Amino acid sequence: METQKYQPNNKVRVVTAASLFDGHDAAINIMRRVIQGTGCEVIHLGHDKSAEEVVNCAIQEDANAIALTSYQGGHNEYFKYIYDLLREKNSPQIKIFGGGGGVILPEEIKDLMEYGIDRIYSPDDGREMGLQGMIDDLVQKSDFATGENITVSDIENIKFEDAKSIAQVISAVENFSDEKPELVEALKEKAKHFNIPIIGITGTGGAGKSSLTDELVRRFLRANADKKIAIISVDPRSEE
């Protein structure tokens, strides 16, 4: 049965991963491709990822949502810890979605969603909604613009060590540059006071961009322990 894909109205970023001590990555690999095909940017971390890794990535990317699979039996603690970490790190706006087939029992799904997890999809959901239907539900719930509350005063509070503040300003410029021209001008003015070299690395998929960047950064930091370097990555498949 053909279903009409939900089309997001905003730029939606979703961090995907399989849980810690979990090598079952087939499901999340399918899900992430469908999420991407529904119009979202996907940051995929792979399998065997800790709650801390997932949450830190979501904050650094200023993501709208986290989508996880958990088939190793520790889902109750794992999902709740991610929920708690997001609030501990002052990022409660990031939504949490997950699934684990028959491993997550109906009463556990109920408990997790009452705890605050936005949605745990069950095998029954898969049968009733279909794969695209579940992803449409996830994307629709995550369809909001990030960076809306950032103002000029926030630019003065940017710290190199604070990835969250940097990510939020990037989101604000990406999503609200027309509505907030003063924000863009303030950033341009601030940039005038710095003489920092900028190196761009580009190439087709599989050309070795990440490997080259990794090697350059490693050598730079080994030779300059007191220096700092920032890396901004852009999805090469982006249409913009």
What are these regions (language model features)?
Residues 1-12:
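Non-catalytic signal-transmission and effector/linker regions of two-component phosphorelay proteins
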Residues 199-201:
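Hydrophobic anchor at the beta1->P-loop junction of P-loop NTPases
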Residues 208:
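Conserved glycine(s) of the Walker
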Residues 131-197:
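Extreme N-terminal, non-catalytic leader segments
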Residues 21, 28-133:
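Cofactor-cradling patches in redox/metallo enzymes
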